[in-house]
């Protein structure tokens, strides 16, 4: 095949090579964690009970590791931007590669305004004194001045950070992910020292019979893939690995992200379950944040959890922004979309037009508000599943 006919030719515009193994683990892990462990942990306990939720997340992580092994094999073999787009082309040709690129581009891009909206909601919860009056209502949800300012400010920060070079973005992602684990380690330690394992009873949701136990685990398995999504951001940035990095380390980063995330979720569920009776914990709006204050009177622990959640939201935002721009860039460079998306900044060696395009769409999110969250989740989930099924 002639080079001009190949969507991934050897002579092509390339991105800066600056990411280390630590950066890739930070990219995958930071994208996985997000804020679900704070916002919907009560739902995990409701569905499975403490042990049911822990087993569900471990088994789910184990099953996704099988998919991760495929990524671990393909990413070093085809270390170019776009991940699944390149994988699909190598296996099926430009037709299915084009479909894959559309599904994944749509999925990743839709998640960026989701994060921009969520940041305003979280900041209002973290600093209730800053909460402002509603400016207008969209879909039954109010949109405040604070939520708009917070969403726009974070979006601009992510856009500028990524435009000015992947090295800065990767360093920030790694540092923020480490801070999340420091915060989480603190409140897990408190729970282990002050909590009571008797609070975990009953261990499973339902009657406790064999069928109920199995049902508890299956109920968690049904939602696990959503909370592990993010490890697939690593292949999107494979082209930007530092020259000294062994390509096989990219595969190690994928597997490491999944394993560490499984341990993270298990510890969070355990800590939440032993600090007080979990049947009472699930009645709180943000159980992971409020349970520690209710159980031990530690207001600072609540703030610590919310601070970790704030960093989690930012790392998932940054990770999905990187993935969205790399898929769009790779598709444009391949000629499957306008070549405009494949342009690279001469100064920073970043996909400048892809960044500006995704950034522009992201900036719309804060003005729509929380009414957009559920539709975004539904559409993004369908797009991700469609893209993954092809590859």
Language model features with spans:
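Membrane-interface "cap" regions at the ends of multi-pass membrane proteins
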Residues: 1-42, 46-51, 64-69, 80-81, ...
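Helix-loop-helix junctions that connect adjacent transmembrane segments
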Residues: 10-15, 54, 130-146, 175-304
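Membrane-water interface regions at transmembrane-helix termini and the short interhelical loops
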Residues: 15, 75, 99, 153-179, ...
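Extracellular loop-to-transmembrane helix junctions
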Residues: 16, 40-141, 257-267
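Juxtamembrane helix-boundary/capping and inter-helix hinge elements in multi-pass membrane proteins
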Residues: 49-50, 78-81, 90-96, 239-250, ...
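Transmembrane alpha-helical segments of multi-pass small-molecule transport proteins
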Residues: 57-59, 127-166, 181-187, 354-361
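TM-loop-TM module centered on a large, flexible mid-protein loop between adjacent transmembrane helices
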Residues: 86-88, 93, 125-130, 253-318, ...
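Hydrophobic alpha-helical segments of multi-pass membrane transport proteins
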Residues: 183-187, 328, 378-391
